[in-house]
UniProtKB/Swiss-Prot annotation:
Pfam family, one: Ribosomal_L14
A GO CC term attached to the entry: cytosolic large ribosomal subunit
Family indicated by similarity: Belongs to the universal ribosomal protein uL14 family.
The protein's name in its UniProt record: Large ribosomal subunit protein uL14
């Protein structure tokens, strides 16, 4: 469950290390977002020479959350951190590598490029 002011790790090689959610896409009264949802975020820390700079406003898709995700078969999956991948307006990732596992729910939301770049899909 990600809400505004939540800080997330960045799971790609765009140069950003940490982002902070400032807006949830999908309605003006929306309170929370989960895996596969797009958020608007501000870059809070970045490495020098990266694609994105500190203070830049970016769109990102959530790939991991600490809050468990209930699946249709009755199982739950939960990760150790909250993480996101920075994307362009056409839902393609800005980076060329993805770090760490991502949830299978991204496949249902048509983030196929992120699924193919990820080292592990859970």
């Amino acid at each position: 469950m990600i809400q505004p002011q939540t800080r997330l790790k960045v799971a790609d090689n765009t140069g950003a290390k940490e982002i902070m959610c400032i807006r949830l896409e999908g309605g003006s009264n929306r309170k929370f977002s989960n895996v596969g949802d797009v958020i608007v975020a501000s870059v809070k820390s970045a490495t020098p020479g990266g694609v994105v700079k500190k203070g830049e406003v970016v769109k990102a898709v959530i790939v991991r959350t600490k809050k468990g995700i209930a699946r249709k078969d009755g199982t739950y999956i939960r990760f150790d951190d909250n993480a996101a991948v920075i994307i362009r307006d056409d839902k393609q990732p800005r980076g060329t590598r993805i770090f760490g596992p991502v949830a299978r729910e991204l496949r249902e939301k048509d983030f196929m490029k992120i699924i193919s770049l990820a080292p592990e899909v859970l």
